[in-house]
Design a protein with these regions (language model features):
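Active-site-proximal alpha-helix that buttresses catalytic centers in soluble enzyme cores
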Residues: 2-354
Length: 354
């Protein structure tokens, strides 16, 4: 009597897994001009960031920006650089990944940057080594912009397109109107608001060229066509960064108990001479000081991690400008960084997709 043949069924050596990719913009490796130049070249060579013709972009970058800006930007980065941990945007993002990893248990969590390090390639390698055949991608930009979310996803798919083993991808959409994000903003900001007791609140979002806002409007007739274009989300402005920013501001104001005259929405960090969305933060805060406002509290709800735009542009330069114009104090509300309410919110955004 012969024995039954052994089973030839394949036994997996490891269980297929779902992983998480947290995706942020990036940062130079150091404030040194060479590192800043390398970062700016990569960032500003992106046609979704400088959305002008290729020749014009090359000339603007190589003849105007790169010869002078790396030194100036490097000096600004040096003011916020931590001697031990380096770039605030990087270490806050790393801390967030650590917190999310701890909360999710055995779910692999990787951090990747659109520009600089850790690269998207290295993050995907990390998830592949963890045997992830499905990846949930969370772009850490609350409001959609082609120059941030769009660019990051385009680069992610470009990299994936060169790989032999491509995981299933599930992208979390912009979360500007997600209750977990809205609650986290209020949880982090409300204690600062109560302690500082401002006489006015600024909600300062990163700016964009007006042309990029118009490009996001499929109707071609809504965005920036009238003053009320961002009063509510509609089909025409569903992908409009400015409309999404105003939505975030309205909800945050409501959660803080602010009336319509207690806060102002504005946009910072404009570059070049082309029209950028208004009102501009640097002009608004001076006007408020001249109008008699003395204590100004600033939220930056487009940035989930503190960075050059919050720590240097607002907490240092904007504060100096406000006080020079007659104000007494300006306080920056910290970004969400890796605060417990934000870690909880990220987990809440991810959990239904796991």
């Amino acid at each position: 009597m012969t024995s039954a043949p052994a089973s030839t069924a394949l036994v997996p050596v490891s269980k297929a897994r779902t992983g998480v990719l947290l995706l942020n913009l990036g940062t130079p490796d150091s404030p040194a001009p060479g590192d800043v130049r390398r970062y700016l070249r990569q960032f500003l060579s992106d046609p979704r960031v400088l959305d002008i013709g290729g020749l014009g972009r090359w000339m603007l970058l190589n003849l105007i920006i790169l010869p002078t800006r790396p030194k100036k930007s490097g000096e600004a980065y040096a003011k916020i650089w931590d001697a031990t941990r380096g770039s605030p945007l990087l270490y806050h993002s790393q801390d967030l990944a650590t917190g999310v990893r701890a909360a999710l248990g055995d779910v692999p969590v990787a951090l990747g940057m659109r520009y600089g390090r850790p690269s998207l390639d290295s993050a995907l390698d990390e998830l592949e080594r963890a045997h992830c055949t499905r990846v949930i991608v969370l772009p850490l930009y609350p409001q959609y912009a082609s120059s941030s979310t769009g660019s990051s996803l385009e680069e992610l798919f470009r990299i994936l397109g060169k790989r032999w083993n491509v995981p299933a991808i599930d992208v979390v959409p912009p979360f500007y109107d997600a209750p977990p994000f809205e609650r986290a903003l209020a949880a982090v900001g409300a204690p600062v608001h109560a302690e500082f007791r401002p006489d006015h609140v600024l909600m300062s979002f990163h700016g964009l060229p007006e042309r990029q806002i118009r490009k996001s409007d499929p109707s071609g007739a809504h965005c920036l066509a009238q003053a009320s274009c961002c009063d509510r989300i509609s089909d025409a402005n569903a992908n409009c960064y400015r409309a999404q920013s105003y939505h975030t501001a309205r909800v945050l104001a409501g959660n803080l108990g602010l009336g319509a005259t207690d806060y102002t929405v504005c946009f910072q960090s404009r570059l070049g001479r082309t029209p950028w969305i208004e009102p501009h933060t640097d002009k608004v805060l001076v006007d408020l000081a001249k109008a008699g406002k003395k204590r100004l509290l600033v939220f930056c709800p487009a940035f989930v991690a503190d960075c050059l735009e919050t720590l240097e542009e607002i907490a240092m330069r904007a504060r100096a400008d406000f006080m020079a114009a007659g104000g007494e104090d300006l306080r920056l509300v910290p970004s969400l960084n890796a605060a417990a309410p934000w870690v909880d919110a990220v987990v809440e955004l991810l959990r239904p997709r796991l």
